């Protein structure tokens, strides 16, 4: 991944020596020692003397067209191995379903060509034909008939296998020593491909459904409910080999994803849009929902992938078809409608979809149209688009497994998968233990907190409250108003309850100046119109300093984005949105915590923070940076990403932050505009933070994969260093050279920990649990931490990677700092799973992305691959009155 910055930014200058992730200095010792189990399984490797041979595979249809479906390719290659075992020297191999095939020894020749005849060549294992533009498969739109001369159930495939490279098996030993070379990572990749191939075959052999979600290594039948929505959850599992400081291990975990409910396409659209009459279908939304899904036709059994919809209805949509001249003359071209074609050629009188658009399953310049009523969605297709609030909550609910249940399921997965019987693994001398790995862990004590009345607050099980304590730095709420977009909420009563609760917590809340109710006729207007109308009422008097906004619904409310933009960009008004369903003291307290933080107050402080006793940080002026990137909804690769950097304020505090944001290219995880040599200071995202600070820095980054660590060090850190040098030149201070510590936090991993209590029941690990040996990297400095209490499901630890440390933290000091940063999150009275700066960066990026409703702009189109990339729009600047605030809290 490259930085796509302007000419003159650091990546174009003379490059310093390439930085690599630092090696481990040692292990932590603080905390109470405990023993845990983890979902890693020990792997023994008895053979290191051979080579993995890498071959390039081309699978083609008889006419030379490439086969693109992974499922078809896998079945063809399986058939090839069965048919041509002697020509392949009896070799077992691992095939990735695309272009890569790996063996544990050389084939007889460097290049092989085979013809494979399949009686059942669909990706689902059922009879089908290749997608054709011709009318022979029941899909009008072309004249290609060659592939239909052979009986439908029999297909010929041409397979070419050619030598590409070889890697020594001894490379596995290198990666276990922490030497991550290209050869060593390739060797592990071969082993992972072997597992995926085994899981794919296992799924085909045992499942009644024809395919499985490609995002998971396998899937487990949990039953498909007959009623319900257009998307359902599907439970599968993930497995991968991991190098650790105690040897090679296999990480196995349960995964859950949303899949599209199989069945008639029209029923799917009715469920998707929550309507009962097909004539009410919004076809713009339908096009977006259906794109790239696979369907099977009821009249031929053929499978296709949807690329869009026809412009006209089935009754009116025309296409050209060639008619052969029986007298030997030239062919004639006739233009017919899809409706007429099916009536004449297939004797099908279309009734249910004659006046609806057709599905286009062809190519952009060569469409192939099929009526909706003849199409069924095939099973087990992963839903890759954005989920609604209800769908997300359903997925979370279905994903939850308590530790006891998860361990039971994982034991079953390992037993049923029977990896030790996989021929390729046996040929490589690899065996996998069936027992969960035991690891040593430590539990760090919760830090003490200080309240406004001088009392110590003791967190128990990662939680505390303000029932008997006051906020430590309350900010008076004055000159404030309530705006009410909800017809269900009594805003006057809500304001009175909020005032009463605030006074109990030591947060003085003046009586509200006014409650503005939305005019009754505005409810059906566009969100922007409703917001503008409300602001006309709001600004009829003096500008308030704070606005409490009551929304009509929780999450994904159309009003939220325009309202936030108007308040924070145009007028500089601090605002808090809410959509209460049940108002009680705890709910109001949580709202007040957010309001106080946004107005510049603090709810609590760490005792060591107040006493300036944090190792290193309290002695040397320090800024803590948190970085995150918010991407568009799944399936929206044409939507710009929003990057955010939050920086700590008022050293020696580590509890107060501000944010800077910018847009960048879609799906780009690296922040490519931390520093650029451009004239407009507003474009330099890191400059604002550095102008407030003039010494050493600690940085925390989220959402980065292990393969991107070098980019964090050599792109992002390099830009920050260059920004510091530029600022030092501006200040004429050649001696200013801050020291950096860079830590990456990963949540998207599959490691889980389990503890057995006195009654021999498997439970979640206690908050403050840290693991830095046994399953960590063999060389690099990393550790797992569960700072929070897992109340529901199985606790997911955060995996921290210390990439760079010029401040020379001890392992204990660094782990305690990370633990402490999980207790300074001003929005709640619980320890959080990550560190507060990263969570704030995530909130800032997600909130600011709503200002311009980027997803709405993209929802009209479907991001066709042939369209030129859109220019990245700039975000509007925050109003100066809120720029330094924790507006994102």
From Swiss-Prot:
PAZ domain: residues covered: 264-379
Disulfide-bond pairs as recorded: none
Keywords: RNA-mediated gene silencing
Keyword Transferase: no
One term of GO molecular function: RNA endonuclease activity
Residues annotated as domain Piwi: 546-853
Low complexity biased stretches: 122-132
Entry keyword annotation includes Cell membrane: no
Protein name: Protein argonaute 15
Species assigned in the record: Oryza sativa subsp. japonica (Rice)
Lineage, broadest ranks: Eukaryota, Viridiplantae, Streptophyta, Embryophyta, Tracheophyta
């Amino acid at each position: 991944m490259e930085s796509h910055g302007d000419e003159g930014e650091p990546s174009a200058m003379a490059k310093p020596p390439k930085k690599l992730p630092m090696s481990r200095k040692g292990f932590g010792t603080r905390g109470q020692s405990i023993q845990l189990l983890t979902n890693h399984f020990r792997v023994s490797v008895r053979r290191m003397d051979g080579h993995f041979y890498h071959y390039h595979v081309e699978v083609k249809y008889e006419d030379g067209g490439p086969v693109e479906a992974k499922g078809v390719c896998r079945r063809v290659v399986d058939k090839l191995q069965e048919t041509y075992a002697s020509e392949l020297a009896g070799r077992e191999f691992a095939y990735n379903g695309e272009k890569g095939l790996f063996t544990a020894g050389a084939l007889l020749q460097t290049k092989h060509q085979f013809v494979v005849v399949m009686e059942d060549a669909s990706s689902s294992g059922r009879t089908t034909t290749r997608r054709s533009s011709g009318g022979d498969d029941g899909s009008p739109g072309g004249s290609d008939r060659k592939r239909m001369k052979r009986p439908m159930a029999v297909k010929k495939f041409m397979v070419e296998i050619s030598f590409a490279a070889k890697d020594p098996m001894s490379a596995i030993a290198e990666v276990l020593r922490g030497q991550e070379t290209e050869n060593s990572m390739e060797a592990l990749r071969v082993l992972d491909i072997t597992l995926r191939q085994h899981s794919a075959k296992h799924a085909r052999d045992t499942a009644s459904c024809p395919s499985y979600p490609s995002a998971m290594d396998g899937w487990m039948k949990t039953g498909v409910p007959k009623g319900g929505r257009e998307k359902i959850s599907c439970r599968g599992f993930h497995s991968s080999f991991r190098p650790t400081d105690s040897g090679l291990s296999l990480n196995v975990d349960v995964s859950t994803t949303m899949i599209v409910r199989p069945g008639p396409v029209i029923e799917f659209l009715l469920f998707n849009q929550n309507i009962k009459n097909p004539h009410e279908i919004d076809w713009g939304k339908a096009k977006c929902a259906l794109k790239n899904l696979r369907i099977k036709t009821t009249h031929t059994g053929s499978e296709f992938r949807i690329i869009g919809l026809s412009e006209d209805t089935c009754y009116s949509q025309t296409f050209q078809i060639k008619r052969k001249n029986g007298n030997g003359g030239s062919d004639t071209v006739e233009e017919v409608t899809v409706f007429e074609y099916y009536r004449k050629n297939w004797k099908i009188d279309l009734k249910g979809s004659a006046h609806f658009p057709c599905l286009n399953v062809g190519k952009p310049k060569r469409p192939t149209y099929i009526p909706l009523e003849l199409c069924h969605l095939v099973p087990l297709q992963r839903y890759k688009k954005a989920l609604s609030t209800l769908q997300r909550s359903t997925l979370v609910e279905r994903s939850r497994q308590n530790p006891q249940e998860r361990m039971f399921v994982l034991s079953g997965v390992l037993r049923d998968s029977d990896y030790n019987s996989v021929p390729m693994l046996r040929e490589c001398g690899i065996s996998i233990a069936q027992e969960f790995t035991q690891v040593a862990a430590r539990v760090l004590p919760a830090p003490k907190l200080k309240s406004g009345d001088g009392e110590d607050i003791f967190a128990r099980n990662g939680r505390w409250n303000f029932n008997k304590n006051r906020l430590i730095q309350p900010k008076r709420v004055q000159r404030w108003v309530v705006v009410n977009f909800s017809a269900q909420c009594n805003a006057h009563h809500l304001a009175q309850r909020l005032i009463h609760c605030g006074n109990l917590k030591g947060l003085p809340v003046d009586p509200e100046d006014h409650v503005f109710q939305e005019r009754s006729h505005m409810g059906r207007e566009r969100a922007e119109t409703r917001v503008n109308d409300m602001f006309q009422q709001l600004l009829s008097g003096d500008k308030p300093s704070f606005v409490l906004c009551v929304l009509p619904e929780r999450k994904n409310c159309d009003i939220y984005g325009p309202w936030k933009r108007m308040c924070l960009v145009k007028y500089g008004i601090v605002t808090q949105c809410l959509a209460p369903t049940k108002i009680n003291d705890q709910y109001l307290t949580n709202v007040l915590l957010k309001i106080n933080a946004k107005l510049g107050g603090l709810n609590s402080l760490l005792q060591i923070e107040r006493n300036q006793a944090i190792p290193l940080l309290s002695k040397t002026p320090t800024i803590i940076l948190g970085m995150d990137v918010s991407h568009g909804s799944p399936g929206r690769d044409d939507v710009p990403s929003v990057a955010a950097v939050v920086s700590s304020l008022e050293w020696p505090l580590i509890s107060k932050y501000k944010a800077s944001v910018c847009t960048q290219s879609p799906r780009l995880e690296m922040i490519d505009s931390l520093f650029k040599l451009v004239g407009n200071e507003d474009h330099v995202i890191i400059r604002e933070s550095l102008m407030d600070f003039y010494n050493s820095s600690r940085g925390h980054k989220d959402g980065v994969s292990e393969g991107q660590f070098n980019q964090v060090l050599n792109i992002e850190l390099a830009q920050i260093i260059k920004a510091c040098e530029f600022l030092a030149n501006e200040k004429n201070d050649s001696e200013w050279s801050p020291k950096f510590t860079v830590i990456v936090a990963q949540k998207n991993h599959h490691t889980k920990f389990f503890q057995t209590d006195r009654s021999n029941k498997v439970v979640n690990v206690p908050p403050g649990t840290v693991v830095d040996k046994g399953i960590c990297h063999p060389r690099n400095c990393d550790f797992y931490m569960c700072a929070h209490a897992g109340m529901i499901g199985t606790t997911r630890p955060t995996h921290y990677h210390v990439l760079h440390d010029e401040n020379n933290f001890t392992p204990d000091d660094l782990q305690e700092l990370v633990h402490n940063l999980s207790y300074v999150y001003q929005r709640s009275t619980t320890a959080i799973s990550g560190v507060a700066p990263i969570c704030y960066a995530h909130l800032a990026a997600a909130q600011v992305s709503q200002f311009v409703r980027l997803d709405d702009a993209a929802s009209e189109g479907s991001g066709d691959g042939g369209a030129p990339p859109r220019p990245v729009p700039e975000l509007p600047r925050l109003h100066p009155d809120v720029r330094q605030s924790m507006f994102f809290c």
